């Protein structure tokens, strides 16, 4: 079964060759500018990668993990990701000993390229095997998905998003095949998919549970299924994340907090010594009261400077400052987010602040210089909405829309990561070509060919437009 999945079919080869050629060019675009710095053997790899790598808001933490293994990711959100990369780290250690250079860029690029290739193949096969489109139509949908700006960037950036896209599409494909045969997902399939998907990015594990719900219907709520497929795997992942935090992270966090507390205490002592040496006040109580006011004013100025930095200034007000809820945002404009970021930057890069990071040097909202960008955005949204209507009787489409709805609740509703919502594009963008596929499937003759041609032209435009901006910016 797996060999059949891995093997590239004869009618897929041309599309795959074109896709690989394009991806190799884009990987070279990311590797070349940083090679002279990242290939050197150094003592502080983490600082080196974080200081130099700058592709939008993507983090080069995978470079850190593969070079000098640590649980560099947020262990609650990505509990297994560092462990998945451990074999790659061992290979890199061997190559570093043999060659005397850090091969991290090439090794990570191989992982990303394989993930991208099979995500591309899965999108094609969803079109052909599940929607029953032609090979040509399915290829157009797959190229459309990867033409989206932040799917393209996810495919070439050392972050987790392209791995998540591959796993989500694998879940959709396997679940779709099972539903087409009127069979539910097997328990072991759901458990394995959940562990892998949630292990890479915790919230995507919920999509596996939604897939299980769609494949089983009411049987999903059977106590045995809830215990074996939902409760035990979720408890295992969460417990592993807690163990991972205590084992690998807690000590460094406590040390950092202690250093910060000591630094503030030392600064206060230094200020007090300077104040007491220069003040004309003689009364010790009066000195203490005046210094307390000076220190309060000083700390207020420090905090004001800290929170005026883009990392904080570009974040809205959270629902609460409690853990997890402090990632939410209730004040950032939803309308501008939808127009300029969710269906804007996610799909078409802006001409200004290209590949800039909202935490460093990019405003939350940027407008396009050309009206054609808004026209293309409008066409894609119309095709998407038309596809939802055309596929309204498709169980597969509603399952994928439930995945999309989950992301929209998190990002648009609760505001999780809303100030850079486009970074998460790979988690949900597949729903657009899938819905357009439903629209194509519902049509016949000239109208079907016209919609396919329009989709192909949009994909070609986005490939050229986004690729050119990336190449000339880097």
Enumerate the predicted regions with their spans.
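Transmembrane-helix motifs of polytopic, lipid-linked glycan transferases
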Residues: 110-131, 383-386
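Lumenal/periplasmic acceptor-binding loop at the mouth of the active site in multi-pass
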Residues: 60-106, 289-384, 397-400
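Transmembrane signal-anchor helices characteristic of membrane glycosylation enzymes that use polyprenol
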Residues: 7-58, 64-69, 232-248, 458-465
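Transmembrane-helix signature of polytopic, membrane-embedded enzymes
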Residues: 123-147, 398
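Specific aromatic-rich, kink-prone transmembrane helix
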Residues: 163-180, 435
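Transmembrane alpha-helix segments characteristic
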Residues: 139-142, 394-411
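Membrane-interface alpha helices of multi-pass inner-membrane proteins
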Residues: 185-204, 208-216, 229-235, 457
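Short acidic/glycine- and proline-prone juxtamembrane loop motifs at membrane-interface regions
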Residues: 156-161
């Amino acid at each position: 079964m797996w060999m059949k999945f891995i093997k590239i079919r004869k009618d897929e080869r041309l599309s795959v060759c074109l896709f690989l050629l394009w991806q190799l060019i884009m990987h070279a675009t990311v590797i070349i500018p940083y090679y002279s710095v990242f290939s050197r053997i150094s003592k502080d790899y983490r600082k080196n990668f974080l200081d130099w790598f700058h592709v939008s808001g993507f983090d080069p933490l995978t470079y850190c993990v593969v070079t000098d293994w640590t649980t560099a990711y947020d262990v609650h959100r990505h509990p297994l990701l560092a462990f998945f990369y451990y074999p790659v780290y061992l290979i890199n250690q061997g190559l570093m000993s043999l060659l005397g250079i850090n091969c991290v860029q090439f090794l990570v690029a191989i992982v990303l390229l394989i993930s991208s290739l099979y995500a591309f193949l899965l999108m094609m096969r969803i079109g052909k095997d599940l929607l029953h489109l032609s090979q040509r139509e399915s290829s157009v949908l797959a190229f459309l998905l990867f033409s989206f700006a932040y799917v393209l960037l996810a495919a070439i950036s050392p972050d987790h998003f392209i791995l998540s896209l591959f796993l989500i599409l694998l879940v959709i494909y396997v679940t779709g095949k099972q539903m087409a045969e009127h069979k539910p997902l097997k328990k072991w399939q759901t458990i394995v998919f959940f562990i892998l998907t949630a292990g890479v990015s915790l919230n995507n594990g919920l999509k596996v549970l939604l897939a299980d719900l769609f494949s089983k219907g009411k049987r999903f709520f059977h106590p045995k299924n809830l215990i074996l497929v939902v409760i035990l795997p979720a408890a295992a992942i969460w417990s592993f994340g807690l163990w991972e935090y205590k084992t690998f992270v807690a000590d460094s966090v406590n040390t950092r907090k202690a250093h910060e507390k000591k630094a503030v205490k030392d600064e206060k002592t230094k200020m007090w010594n300077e104040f007491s040496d220069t003040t004309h006040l003689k009364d010790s109580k009066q000195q203490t009261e005046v210094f307390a006011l000076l220190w309060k004013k000083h700390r207020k100025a420090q905090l004001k400077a800290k929170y005026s930095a883009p990392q904080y200034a570009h974040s809205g007000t959270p629902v609460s400052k409690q853990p997890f809820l402090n990632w939410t945002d209730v004040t950032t404009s939803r309308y501008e987010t939808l127009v300029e970021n969710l269906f804007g930057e996610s799909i078409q890069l802006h001409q200004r602040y290209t590949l800039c990071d909202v935490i460093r040097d990019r405003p939350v909202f940027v407008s396009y210089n050309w009206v054609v960008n808004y026209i293309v955005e409008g066409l894609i949204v119309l095709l998407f909405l038309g596809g939802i209507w055309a596929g309204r009787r498709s169980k597969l489409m509603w399952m994928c829309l439930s995945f999309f709805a989950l992301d929209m609740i998190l990002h648009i509703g609760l505001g999780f990561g809303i100030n850079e919502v486009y970074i998460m594009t790979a988690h949900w963008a597949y729903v657009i070509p899938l819905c357009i596929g439903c629209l194509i499937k519902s049509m016949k003759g000239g109208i079907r060919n016209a919609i396919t041609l329009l989709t192909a032209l949009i994909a070609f435009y986005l490939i050229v437009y986004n690729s050119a901006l990336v190449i000339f910016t880097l």
